[in-house]
């Protein structure tokens, strides 16, 4: 039902008020909701590892894949939003039941004669320096799905207001979501840096800037398209989120050139985490010791900078989050251990590799948690409050700590149920094990993540222009969200099925 033009202006104000002046929820509750994703990954992995449920990939397999990796996450922010622990318990019960069911025995491949085996092994491509690990696909795919769900769900009354973006001070699920989007982009961005190091090359600053601008341009164009669309259609806006003209695509678009500049600083401080902390601390000091905080929160909007001050200055916090993500990527993407050719050492090599990665990830998780504690605790720390609006130091540390713990949880599922992936000796075997250990739905979201996110924004706008979301009941809300995510997932899986990659 279209909204009558005579009430459009007052309805627009209602929608703006609906997402304004919110104070968020507790960090512990947000952690419980976020925990649904790795628990879902556990259920999926037990089904696959014990029962080979998704091999071959049938329509039933797709339905269960969708229900787990999309449906459960949708439930966590709607019908089960007040009981995330119960949802986690129910999912863990399913995982335990499936695990206890006798394992499905797969038919073994016929043994090849010795001469055929030697020919086969000689033609196999050896492993490279980097690896596409299943837990990274699961982590990033789940993050993209939750983000897509929330950007539409927030406009309905069924979505709890404590999960929507906070006005100034506090924490919320959507505040974590936007930070996680940037953090995960940083993880992925470490891949070309690692390739350069492996090849012993170091691209000059001018080359890095040219490459970064090529990545930035499409995002900046999308930012301008969104700006013109919002203004032209008189769409409801939340000005204190980014400013009058700024939007998230501009933040994403300006990240690559600044990251390229910061890469030069590695000669002085050879750590992305160190650079992230340095930037975050300097920015926080400026907020606390100058009039910058007051300017961002209460200054008049009388020129282009002041109109977009939230977007401009929060960019430095998001840059710090991106660098923290890049540091994590430098840890989890490479193959840090050399592999032995002999079969007797394969298991040892894989075991040592898993243990080493586990200890490093756990260590960094503790570091980020400790830093967040000292930044925010009133008794033992600095007593600072989280602000996504300014993307201050506590916000950056909260995002880094939460994502580090989430990655660790996804990795534990990976290492426990698909350990053979870490013992693969050639590209073909590793690819087969990777496909076995990852959901087709999550792989599809990963492949065209930014394009699907853009499509989700378009669908969100379409729904808001045609449906009075504030007047929709619980059942209808769930129906709309399921249809919306069903369409998005169908597009993502369809693109993947036809081997289409959209680079933005």
From Swiss-Prot:
Coiled coil: none annotated. It is found in: Endoplasmic reticulum membrane. Glycans are attached at residues 21, 346, 499. The keyword Signal does not apply. The keyword Hydrolase does not apply. Its EC number is 2.3.-.-. This is GPI-anchored wall transfer protein 1. It comes from Neurospora crassa (strain ATCC 24698 / 74-OR23-1A / CBS 708.71 / DSM 1257 / FGSC 987).
